[in-house]
């Protein structure tokens, strides 16, 4: 489906998380055929005795379901693996929705790492993206409740909710400090591929995640661009948090010769399974791939495969570095255990976990692209000081205004705000709130859209290949 592309780093004025980061494989994968060693009942004598002791001796009434759920959670937590988790019925339903259909929430992929709940990437066009949420932002509180000690699904359950309702997030961003956001939840669409024809017959294709329909969406996008005369392609995987592994394999095959490696899977016994391109490649025209620190999991599989097996240049920043594979087993009551079952390796056998993939052509965005969102519901005025004032000063400076960045809302800054309001035909109050803040976010978005230095580098690189 054709649609005007939006940059993954858009800063806007509204706001509104989805699911945990995972590289998910479905039941028809050979990985699910791996057998595990059986465990004798004697191994669970201690567990059974503890259960009986709690049932008989605890001073209050107990709930069998809660005890069993707690035991499973404890076993999963003992693995010390942020990608393995136990999901109750509600959490499992939310997880399924994020890879198969639209869902309601704020639209951001999150993970638990070293006891912290972190943003992997906001989903394209989501309230989270519009709010200016960035990869690596740490979630501190949800509606005033600390997420410390929670697993990722517990945190997600707090963040998600019905369309139109709001959730308050307290985030911490490296180099900025704590940020408070009030985000309106919305329906997060399932569409994952967006394409358009750029100048010089360059087909730009943005892939936002890997869901059940992504391979078909990509094929349709390529067919459409081919009919329009595309002579080369830019695949934009920036901010893509991953998803279904088989989709990444199918999509990679479109750009890789039959018989060449796409990826490898390594099991705990050391055996490896090599996934190869099983069909003739579809795209033979020059291609480049854009990546950044929000490119993760299945997106990293595709990026690495195209580079190592088709010599496609990667452009941008070092990727996230998520190199494990999960399966999900559903139980009769609707609960699910999502478990890491293997490592995945690149086509050449490299494990990129916690390291990421370094691009061949480094390209960074302007510093102002990393500025946090300013809440339009809050008021900043003369006499105020602090981080948010400093952010506003940096934004106006990026837009060309002469601003002293000193974190102080002094008379000089009041004058600058009035200049901005006059230019944008707003009431000249010198106060930053409401429509003024909203307009500031929109104007910064426009500047970012016009100064996508990574996309410019991708176009420059592709032209040399064409």
Swiss-Prot record:
Leader peptide range in chain numbering: 1-36
CDD domains tied to this protein: cpPDZ_CPP-like (cd06782), Peptidase_S41_CPP (cd07560)
GO biological process: proteolysis; signal transduction
EC code: 3.4.21.102
Keyword Signal attributed: yes
Entry annotation: catalytic residues: 297, 308, 322
A single cellular component GO annotation: outer membrane-bounded periplasmic space
Domain PDZ: 96-174
Disruption phenotype: Sporulation is not significantly affected.
Description of what induces expression: Is expressed only during vegetative growth.
Keywords: Hydrolase, Protease, Serine protease, Signal
Highest taxon above the source species: Bacteria
An MF annotation (GO) of this entry: endopeptidase activity
Keyword Protease assigned: yes
Catalytic reaction(s) noted: The enzyme shows specific recognition of a C-terminal tripeptide, Xaa-Yaa-Zaa, in which Xaa is preferably Ala or Leu, Yaa is preferably Ala or Tyr, and Zaa is preferably Ala, but then cleaves at a variable distance from the C-terminus. A typical cleavage is -Ala-Ala-|-Arg-Ala-Ala-Lys-Glu-Asn-Tyr-Ala-Leu-Ala-Ala
Enzyme class: hydrolase
Protein family (similarity comment): Belongs to the peptidase S41A family.
Protein name as it appears in the record: Carboxy-terminal processing protease CtpA
């Amino acid at each position: 489906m054709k649609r005007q592309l939006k940059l993954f780093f858009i800063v806007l004025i509204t706001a509104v998380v989805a699911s945990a980061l995972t590289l998910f494989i479905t039941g028809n994968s050979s990985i699910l055929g791996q057998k595990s060693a059986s465990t004798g009942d004697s191994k669970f004598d201690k567990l059974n005795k503890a259960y009986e002791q709690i049932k008989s001796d605890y001073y209050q009434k107990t709930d069998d379901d809660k005890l069993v759920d707690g035991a499973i959670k404890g076993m999963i937590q003992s693995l010390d693996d942020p990608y393995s988790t136990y999901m109750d019925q509600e959490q499992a339903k939310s997880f399924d929705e994020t890879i198969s259909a639209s869902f309601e929430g704020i639209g951001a992929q999150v993970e638990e790492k070293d006891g912290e709940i972190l943003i992997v990437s906001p989903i394209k066009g989501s309230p989270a993206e519009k709010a200016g949420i960035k990869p690596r932002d740490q979630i501190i509180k949800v509606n005033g409740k600390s997420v410390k000690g929670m697993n990722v699904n517990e945190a997600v359950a707090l963040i998600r909710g019905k369309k139109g309702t709001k959730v308050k997030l307290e985030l911490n961003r490296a180099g900025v400090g704590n940020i408070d956001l009030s985000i309106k939840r919305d329906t997060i669409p399932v569409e994952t591929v967006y394409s358009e024809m750029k100048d010089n017959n360059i087909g730009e294709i943005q892939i936002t995640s890997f869901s059940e329909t992504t391979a078909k969406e990509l094929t349709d996008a390529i067919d459409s661009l081919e009919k329009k005369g595309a002579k080369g392609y830019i695949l934009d995987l920036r901010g893509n948090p991953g998803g279904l592994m088989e989709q990444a394999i199918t999509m990679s095959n479109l750009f890789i010769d039959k018989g060449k490696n796409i990826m490898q899977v390594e099991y705990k016994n050391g055996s490896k399974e090599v996934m190869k391109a099983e069909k003739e490649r579809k795209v033979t025209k020059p291609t480049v791939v854009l990546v950044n620190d929000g490119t993760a999991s299945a997106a990293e599989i595709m990026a690495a495969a195209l580079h190592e097996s088709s010599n496609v240049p990667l452009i941008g920043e070092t990727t996230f570095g998520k190199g494990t594979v999960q399966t999900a087993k559903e139980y009769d009551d609707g609960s699910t255990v999502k478990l890491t079952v293997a490592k995945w390796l690149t086509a050449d056998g490299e494990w990129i976990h916690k390291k990421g993939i370094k691009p061949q052509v480094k390209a960074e965005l302007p510093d102002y692209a990393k500025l946090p969102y300013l809440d339009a519901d809050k008021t900043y005025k003369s006499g105020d000081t602090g981080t948010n004032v400093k952010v506003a000063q940096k934004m106006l400076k990026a837009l060309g205004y002469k601003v002293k960045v000193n974190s102080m809302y002094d008379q000089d800054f009041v004058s600058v705000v009035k200049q901005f309001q006059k230019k944008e035909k707003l009431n000249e109050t010198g106060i930053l709130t409401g429509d003024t803040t909203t307009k500031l976010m929109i104007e910064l978005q426009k500047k970012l859209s016009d100064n996508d230095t990574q996309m410019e580098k991708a176009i420059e690189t592709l032209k040399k290949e064409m």
